[in-house]
Swiss-Prot record:
Residues 136-145 have a biased composition (Basic and acidic residues). Keywords: Cell membrane, Cell wall biogenesis/degradation, Cellulose biosynthesis, Coiled coil, Glycoprotein, Glycosyltransferase, Lipoprotein, Manganese, Membrane, Metal-binding, Transferase, Transmembrane, Transmembrane helix, Zinc, Zinc-finger. Residues 358-385 form a coiled coil. It comes from Arabidopsis thaliana. This is Cellulose synthase A catalytic subunit 8 [UDP-forming]. It is a multi-pass membrane protein.
Amino acid sequence: MMESRSPICNTCGEEIGVKSNGEFFVACHECSFPICKACLEYEFKEGRRICLRCGNPYDENVFDDVETKTSKTQSIVPTQTNNTSQDSGIHARHISTVSTIDSELNDEYGNPIWKNRVESWKDKKDKKSKKKKKDPKATKAEQHEAQIPTQQHMEDTPPNTESGATDVLSVVIPIPRTKITSYRIVIIMRLIILALFFNYRITHPVDSAYGLWLTSVICEIWFAVSWVLDQFPKWSPINRETYIDRLSARFEREGEQSQLAAVDFFVSTVDPLKEPPLITANTVLSILALDYPVDKVSCYVSDDGAAMLSFESLVETADFARKWVPFCKKYSIEPRAPEFYFSLKIDYLRDKVQPSFVKERRAMKRDYEEFKIRMNALVAKAQKTPEEGWTMQDGTSWPGNNTRDHPGMIQVFLGYSGARDIEGNELPRLVYVSREKRPGYQHHKKAGAENALVRVSAVLTNAPFILNLDCDHYVNNSKAVREAMCFLMDPVVGQDVCFVQFPQRFDGIDKSDRYANRNIVFFDVNMRGLDGIQGPVYVGTGTVFRRQALYGYSPPSKPRILPQSSSSSCCCLTKKKQPQDPSEIYKDAKREELDAAIFNLGDLDNYDEYDRSMLISQTSFEKTFGLSTVFIESTLMENGGVPDSVNPSTLIKEAIHVISCGYEEKTEWGKEIGWIYGSITEDILTGFKMHCRGWRSIYCMPLRPAFKGSAPINLSDRLHQVLRWALGSVEIFLSRHCPLWYGCSGGRLKLLQRLAYINTIVYPFTSLPLVAYCTLPAICLLTGKFIIPTLSNLASMLFLGLFISIILTSVLELRWSGVSIEDLWRNEQFWVIGGVSAHLFAVFQGFLKMLAGLDTNFTVTSKTADDLEFGELYIVKWTTLLIPPTSLLIINLVGVVAGFSDALNKGYEAWGPLFGKVFFAFWVILHLYPFLKGLMGRQNRTPTIVILWSILLASVFSLVWVRINPFVSKTDTTSLSLNCLLIDC
């Protein structure tokens, strides 16, 4: 019988203690946050009587009958809160050279790091193992103390009790009970009504149109399953509130160096002719002008097309930043992307008190216009490529003239040793990166480019956090990073947070949002629902990652506190563990080995190459991270940073080495670490892997949107964007990472979170029943049949109850989320438009790609616009995606005309059944109405080829259907022939 050990306090590191009856001391019965009596008493004295984790109030009788069982040693501050020397390390500030070196390099190792503490770690590990053998009943506190290096004991200081040092940086604000309770009740009622509805539908077939009835029932069952997958992850939505002032009070004290964590920004671009350099420049400028310590910000721009235009535009951007950044910080302007700041139609003098503002703003606007002219000149020059290729200003050939065969390129702008702003202040570091490409190597598109940036940034700056942005998403809120740090740097909340996701907001969308480009329902409803479970999914941009989570590590384990009802019997009864998959056990052991290395080796210094490689077991790390000792050493530094004594030239060569085309071969890159390969929607796959490891994510919605971007408002471009997303979901469904079964044995992914991921991969398959269901109204009108038998009073009440429950669910969802009914209706319309076009094509293309090996190449959506406002909205571009919805529109319109004609011929009795069929057809037409408007364009004209193909398909379908008439039963045809014979007689 094993003795139950007391958990450790998450505030001071001491044992929590037990009550007189032997149960563990639990302060908060809602979340069981581990805190000892001494720390709890301090919280009460300071007037904060709420739980540090969940925010629920403590019970005042919690101190009764408690026996403290603490260690006699001094208080130990948890290592998670130690953000001193490692966070503030110099991030390769002396790099200012350009390097273009092929992948065949002789690595220069010899960085002086980590000697004394490795030896102390080894000694303590040996002592700990010997002590366990001699004294198996050693207390938990003594074992915990043995894991902490000696130097950390010497540097221990009592917890800071100044104002703001212990205040929580964020709180969870639950949805009011009056709103969420009624919402849940209606969901349960809708489930019950659905069960009764399907019982009626299945037990009351339509014999005269059995095929139509069966098709409709199958479609309705699929729609119900799809609704369950979408609805239940929204069961527990929450809101969050951050306190940036408390973050500053804790980590930015007057007269001291800022202790805020460093952040590496990733900006990706491929084709500068389709992703205008001016848009990318605005994104970069908004990053460089952030309200964040300049020595903590580094911006990496990935040019995956190796275009000289991208490089030259970045040179111009770095030069203009010397004027723009001090102007933004002096006058605290928002947003800090010049194109969008100067285009704002607001009173820009509001809240401005400096007399010089108007003059300097006018001068800055003139400078920006000159900057735009220079950028436009670069774009105009790049329209025609010289036969001999591009040449740089010094006369040498541009290394990236062959975009598929070129060396790796890195250029560092600005920063500590680079150019300063016009006021002489240091600017954030700006780095141009173009990874090596050679024929015969798989490059994995955007995911491969992001992984190359992960390695380059780890070698040069190694910030503990990474923020990735698309090139067309600029920073709209200069304090966005501080918002994320309120979660990630909180020692209580942020320990197991892998990333903070911000919602996507867009500029340049028409007021009616015809094609639901804003995705308001997804970002304001679904994502907030996921935040109440295990966190939102990763959506590809506007995300702040914890670097260690990208390296495949598991979150730090939390002490487990048993509930009071079971604590008394925990020594006698043990729960039988479920058998685990051997591959999962191996991966868990591998992660635990790496986690132990991080915990114990994260702060090592001054160690030679030979002994270091012996201690770290370098071979196993190389199989995971690749053949770079410098990069491997950076992965062991949990708080990031680069040693001061590192040779800058060595780092540049090493950075070139880690972006070589063959670096990822025989490693875990893209499989277990970094952005995950296997789908063109690498964002969903990457976030899914992190959640399967036990990490959680957080959804941050500041009042001022953190980031804003552009969206394709043209119908064809929008459908191609949706096609890409849907194809990625089909690829994940057909891969080994399918959420239906992947990670089930680990038990780290919560059930509702798994349902949400299942919904993200199966939604394209809804297109098959949706196309069939949208065709049924036309068939019913053309044949005179219907999918529902004559309704009784009870059946009518059932149908009415179903419609009311659907409406109530939507209304109550709008009530707690704040989404408008117009946004909800646009979302429903485009769900049908995308379902019968892009999703349908994605299903077939996905199966062809995954099963037959036929690859589908996607081009980057052009982000240029018409001179007129919303000019792109009215442009009609030919694509095969337009044919299915156009055909459905024509078929249903023909069916409505045929139905009214038939009713006129048959008389008064035919009008009653007609209304049900016409309502069914108009339901389809109303959902496709935005598509119809998009086809008409500004001049109300549709491409002739679309009209011809659609009319041809609709006509052939109608004629064949009337000729075959397959859903008329044989008894009907027999009776019809007999009647004809009687008439002849």
